[in-house]
């Protein structure tokens, strides 16, 4: 019964519909009585606020989580909120804290904390460290993240293996499994793109379009060279969240292929640089610009 209470909330979370997750948890607050269930709901509630960029709210509401009675998961959420609020400024201290927690054994049996730490490592592009944290994990969110990391480092074989493990834990038609398979199909390319696109479209029709689902559809459309369709999907995503870095990156890619005016493309590149300095697209642009400056200096 406990799992049923949070089922819709978690499903919205996996789909990237963070406000609906928050709304569902708030609506069912009187049913969330058990201590373990309250801890679970708080975890997803604060993850949503963090995803929305409401870092100060999380830090303010959890400020009493200190001392001998400190909840490790809440401490992890505080660390994530603090880190994301000022990544460059808080990077060193965050990584030191994580190292200490790992050394103290705090992380080993706390799968929520494992995901939080892996998220920070992923953001810092420390993929080996993230994989070590999630090594041998057998929980849904951890496996979903493992698949993301394996795809990021071009290990499609290991992503497929993690997906096979996931299918043993949850129904293949459950949202996390459908999302994971769709991304694996995207990386397989060619005919698999059609299957991935259908999956994203079906989820969007069933649960409503979210930036995550719209971006998934757009990536498929770009891969199939259906750039006008991709543009329409990405503009819809921007209307829902103008600060979604993946939407901006995919729109840049789409507009380059559509040969849109340079000033339009550059405007989105500048926006992405400001919002997400560590995004793969930002890093690639910065590297290209640096190489251009080096080449230019040789002729001065």
Curated annotation (Swiss-Prot):
It is found in: Cytoplasm; Golgi apparatus membrane; Cytoplasmic vesicle, COPI-coated vesicle membrane. GO terms for molecular function: structural molecule activity. GO terms for biological process: endoplasmic reticulum to Golgi vesicle-mediated transport; intra-Golgi vesicle-mediated transport; protein transport; retrograde vesicle-mediated transport, Golgi to endoplasmic reticulum. The keyword Methyltransferase does not apply. Its main location: cytoplasm. Gene3D superfamilies: Tetratricopeptide repeat domain. The keyword Protein transport applies. It comes from the Eukaryota. It is a peripheral membrane protein. Coiled coil: none annotated. GO terms for cellular component: COPI vesicle coat; Golgi membrane. InterPro entries: Coatomer_esu (IPR006822), TPR-like_helical_dom_sf (IPR011990). Keywords: Cytoplasm, Cytoplasmic vesicle, ER-Golgi transport, Golgi apparatus, Membrane, Protein transport, Transport. Belongs to the COPE family. The coatomer is a cytosolic protein complex that binds to dilysine motifs and reversibly associates with Golgi non-clathrin-coated vesicles, which further mediate biosynthetic protein transport from the ER, via the Golgi up to the trans Golgi network. The coatomer complex is required for budding from Golgi membranes, and is essential for the retrograde Golgi-to-ER transport of dilysine-tagged proteins. Oligomeric complex that consists of at least the alpha, beta, beta', gamma, delta, epsilon and zeta subunits. This is Coatomer subunit epsilon. It comes from Dictyostelium discoideum (Social amoeba).
